[in-house]
Amino acid sequence: SAPAQWKLWLVMDPRTVMIGTAAWLGVLALLIHFLLLGTERFNWIDTGLKEQKATAAAQAAITPAPVTAAAK
């Protein structure tokens, strides 16, 4: 019954429950973040690296080599 819910804290230590809850939430948050980082769509760290590499490779292929005095 609702009026007797306070008796639960006579059985369980409130500090232990709060520390356990905080530890579980921290582990859960890390797990969710690492799962998201492992996906292609939701990885916010490597965003745009493939596009930047492709652009750099295309620009390197288009850019002509400098003409030196020995080549003339």
UniProtKB/Swiss-Prot annotation:
It is found in: Cell inner membrane. It comes from the Bacteria. One of its GO terms (cellular component) is plasma membrane light-harvesting complex. A bacteriochlorophyll binds at H33. Residues 1-16 are cytoplasmic. Residues 38-72 are periplasmic. SUPFAM superfamilies: Light-harvesting complex subunits. Keywords: Antenna complex, Bacteriochlorophyll, Cell inner membrane, Cell membrane, Chlorophyll, Chromophore, Light-harvesting polypeptide, Magnesium, Membrane, Metal-binding, Transmembrane, Transmembrane helix. InterPro entries: Antenna_a/b, Antenna_alpha, Antenna_alpha_CS, Light-harvesting_complex. GO terms for molecular function: bacteriochlorophyll binding; electron transporter, transferring electrons within the cyclic electron transport pathway of photosynthesis activity; metal ion binding. Coiled coil: none annotated. The chain crosses the membrane at residues 17-37. It is a single-pass type II membrane protein. GO terms for biological process: photosynthesis, light reaction. Antenna complexes are light-harvesting systems, which transfer the excitation energy to the reaction centers. The core complex is formed by different alpha and beta chains, binding bacteriochlorophyll molecules, and arranged most probably in tetrameric structures disposed around the reaction center. The non-pigmented gamma chains may constitute additional components. Belongs to the antenna complex alpha subunit family. This is Light-harvesting polypeptide B-885 alpha-1 chain.
